[in-house]
């Protein structure tokens, strides 16, 4: 016995066994009516139990063989199913006009019979059977990925077919609940998948619109979940006139061993014949020997080479430890391509001028293809970042994470480019009632979330691009504070009351500022909310660009009640240094305010990593309106006798000269006035106030 054959033991069946399964077929003189009632039962969410496979096969036999049982029994479909262990039991009832009449009279079918008695069916069209089967076929291409990806793919195909005028499906079929039911049926029913795939490949005549859709869906299902097979056969095992040659990047000994094992697994897969490209969908034997993890180096190299050739499907994750190998294979393949093209041009060019023209063209072609591929991959990476952020928010929401009653998530703004600010001093008239709630605020957000979810990529999608390194998601979600300042509007001190026109301001801001487009995809992510969250909840990004909202609204309106609110992760959120109201009474400040935040040489180094995760804690006297009734602006005297106009001086982009002079003199590590001016916009309003009050 070859000792190395121990490694192969258990990978091949030595005593093949097929589990027998009985399938009930229904045969009546009113077959179309029976089939329509089966469709109605499925659409209504009724669980047919072990009659489901038989009901689906009855639909297929009616559609493809016009319920001719003899033709079906002699067909390749019936032969394959019998070899797979299926036995057909035909229930005949010539006079039956209802599905109820053909169900066997057995005790365990009594709940099904009761459910079917309440079902009313008025449809009796034969074309509805083909419509239902074509609708089921739309779920095949992404069936192995997951329900979300499969449903989104089906919806895209429905849109295409409707635009082309091929077929229109009933609206209630396109609801999420119904599509999940169909997905579950297709995922569990081997017979339905097999018949659709078989007929989609082999039906060559008698096509109607429904058969055309089925054939199109089956064509898109080929090699679904078998990306490694497709990439290795196309790019690694290169087929030439002289035979099959290995790609130069896999000619080392260790990778050669993986190639040999992979070829053995491919030979086992090829025994399935025309069904081999659908092995993952049909869950055929030997499919578990074709996982990426069994051939890590071969898989990484194959995907890198495929990406270099313009394949945008080669973004599947091959393991963190092999990501660098994939990138190296990508770079090496690009260099090899250029070298081969150069050699070909030298051979076919007749003179130097033609050679230069050809070299320039091929160089441009390679660059264009490479840039287009990277653009598509970047787009997939962005979609994944949005999906990951949404999933993280959903996890927090599901865990019921809530803040304490004395904490509210707030976002204190950075100052943007220089803007002239005028603050009108006038008496404050406190309203006795809370501001009116924003109409349909919560409903509007949920509508946006559901409408934008179609662009997400499922995390389990083998064709979705996963992040190439651990920092990808963090880098894409976190926006530096210098960028966030560019698309902020009129500077305003942080206020505790909420903006009443946030949705209108958001639309104006998005339409007038192009720099903000790159940040929009993060704003569309759903907020983490609980059922009892305040209607006044908004985030600072939506309320920064309102006309006339710089200081007046924050003074006029009382703070909202301290409802329990969720911690919102906002890329421009800053940590509080103080717990006092910026428009409240200015008292003594405890603590060393001038202590550098991040480094001893930088007085106000921006906390880009921690600011997005810290919430502000309100002072106990925050809700006391009497403490806040003051006229603004006013001249304030600091602890050391310096004066400045509050809050006007703190709203300017550049700090007052008195503050700059004091900071330069009093800091332990001397810094220049230029550095301080550069750091001033990165301070939150509270940080500026505390610095000013301690000078």
Swiss-Prot record:
Q: Its principal location?
A: virion
What ranges does the record list as Polar residues composition bias?
Answer: 495-505, 537-552
Q: Does the keyword Disulfide bond apply?
A: no
Short motif (PTAP/PSAP motif): ranges: 603-606
UniProt-recorded Gene Ontology molecular function terms: RNA binding
- One GO BP annotation of this record: viral RNA genome packaging
The known PTMs are summarized as: Phosphorylated.
Task: List the residue ranges forming a coiled coil, or say none.
Answer: 316-341, 372-399
Quick one: where's region Disordered?
A: 423-458, 483-515, 527-612
Domain comment in the entry: This protein can be divided into a hydrophobic N-terminal half, and a hydrophilic and highly acidic C-terminal half. The coiled coil region is critical for homooligomerization, for the interaction with VP35 and for NP function in RNA synthesis.
- Describe the task this protein carries out: Encapsidates the genome, protecting it from nucleases. The encapsidated genomic RNA is termed the nucleocapsid and serves as template for transcription and replication. During replication, encapsidation by NP is coupled to RNA synthesis and all replicative products are resistant to nucleases.
How it assembles, according to the record, is: Homooligomer. Homomultimerizes to form the nucleocapsid. Binds to viral genomic RNA. Interacts with VP35 and VP30 to form the nucleocapsid. Also interacts with VP24 and VP40.
Family, similarity comment: Belongs to the filoviruses nucleoprotein family.
According to UniProt, the name of this protein is: Nucleoprotein
Its source organism is Lake Victoria marburgvirus (strain Popp-67) (MARV)
Lineage here is: Viruses, Riboviria, Orthornavirae, Negarnaviricota, Haploviricotina
């Amino acid at each position: 016995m070859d000792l190395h054959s121990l490694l192969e033991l258990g990978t091949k069946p030595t005593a093949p066994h097929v589990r027998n399964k009985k399938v009930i077929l229904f045969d009546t003189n009113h077959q179309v009516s029976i089939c329509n009632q089966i469709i109605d039962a499925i659409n209504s969410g009724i669980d047919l139990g072990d009659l489901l496979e038989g009901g689906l096969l009855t639909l297929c036999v009616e559609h493809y063989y016009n319920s001719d049982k003899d033709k079906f029994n002699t067909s390749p479909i019936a032969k394959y199913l019998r070899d797979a262990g299926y036995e057909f039991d035909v229930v005949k009832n010539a006079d039956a006009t209802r599905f109820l009449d053909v169900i066997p009279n057995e005790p365990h079918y009594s709940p099904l019979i009761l459910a079917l008695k309440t079902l009313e069916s008025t449809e009796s069209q034969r074309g509805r059977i083909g419509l239902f089967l074509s609708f089921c076929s739309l779920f095949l291409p992404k069936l192995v990925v997951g329900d979300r990806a499969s449903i989104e793919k089906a919806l895209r195909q429905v849109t295409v077919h409707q635009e082309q005028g091929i077929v229109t499906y009933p609206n209630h079929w396109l609801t999420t609940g119904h599509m999940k039911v169909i997905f579950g049926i297709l995922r569990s029913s081997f017979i339905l998948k097999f018949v659709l795939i078989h007929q989609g490949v082999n039906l060559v005549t008698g096509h109607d619109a429904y058969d055309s859709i089925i054939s199109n869906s089956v064509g898109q299902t080929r090699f679904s979940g078998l990306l490694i097979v497709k990439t290795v056969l196309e790019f690694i095992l290169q087929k030439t006139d002289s035979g099959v040659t290995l790609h130069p990047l896999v000619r080392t000994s260790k990778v050669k061993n993986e190639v040999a094992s992979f070829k053995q697994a491919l030979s086992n897969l090829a025994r399935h014949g025309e069904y081999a490209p659908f092995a993952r969908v049909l869950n055929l034997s030997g499919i578990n020997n074709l996982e990426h993890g069994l051939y890590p180096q071969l898989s990484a190299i194959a995907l890198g080479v495929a990406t270099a050739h313009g394949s945008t499907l080669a973004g599947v994750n091959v393991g963190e430890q092999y990501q660098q190998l994939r990138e190296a294979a990508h770079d090496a393949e690009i260099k090899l391509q250029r070298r081969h093209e150069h050699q070909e041009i030298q051979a076919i060019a007749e003179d130097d001028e033609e050679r230069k023209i050809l070299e320039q063209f091929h160089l441009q072609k390679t660059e264009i293809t490479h840039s287009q591929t990277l653009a598509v991959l970047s787009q997939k990476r962005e979609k994944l970042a949005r999906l990951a952020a949404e999933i993280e928010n959903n996890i927090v929401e599901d865990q019921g994470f809530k803040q304490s009653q004395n904490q509210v998530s707030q976002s204190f703004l950075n100052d943007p480019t220089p803007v002239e600010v005028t603050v009108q001093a006038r008496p404050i008239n406190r309203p006795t009632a809370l501001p009116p709630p924003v109409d349909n605020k919560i409903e509007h957000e949920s509508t946006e979330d559901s409408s934008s979810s179609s662009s997400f990529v499922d995390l389990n999608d083998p064709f979705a691009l996963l992040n190439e390194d651990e920092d990808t998601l963090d880098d894409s979600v976190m926006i530096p504070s210098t960028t966030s300042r560019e698309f902020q509007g009129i500077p305003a001190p942080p206020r505790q009351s909420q903006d009443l026109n946030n949705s209108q301001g958001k639309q104006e801001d998005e339409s007038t500022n192009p720099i903000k487009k790159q940040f929009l995809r993060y704003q569309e992510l759903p907020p983490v909310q609980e059922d009892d969250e305040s209607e006044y909840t908004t985030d600072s990004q939506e309320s920064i660009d309102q006309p006339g909202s710089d200081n007046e609204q924050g003074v006029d309106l009382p703070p909202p009640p301290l409802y329990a609110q969720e911690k919102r992760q906002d890329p421009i959120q800053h940590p509080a240094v103080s717990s006092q109201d910026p428009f409240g009474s200015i008292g003594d400040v405890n603590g060393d305010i001038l202590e550098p935040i991040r480094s001893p040489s930088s007085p106000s180094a921006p906390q880009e990593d921690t600011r997005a995760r810290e919430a502000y804690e309100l002072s106990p006297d925050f809700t006391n309106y009497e403490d806040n009734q003051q006229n603004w602006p006013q001249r304030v005297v600091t602890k050391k006798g310096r004066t400045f106009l509050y809050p006007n001086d703190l709203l300017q982009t550049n700090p007052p000269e008195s503050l700059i002079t004091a900071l330069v003199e009093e800091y332990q590590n001397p810094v220049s006035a230029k550095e301080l001016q550069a750091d001033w916009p990165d301070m939150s309003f509270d940080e500026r106030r505390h610095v000013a009050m301690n000078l």
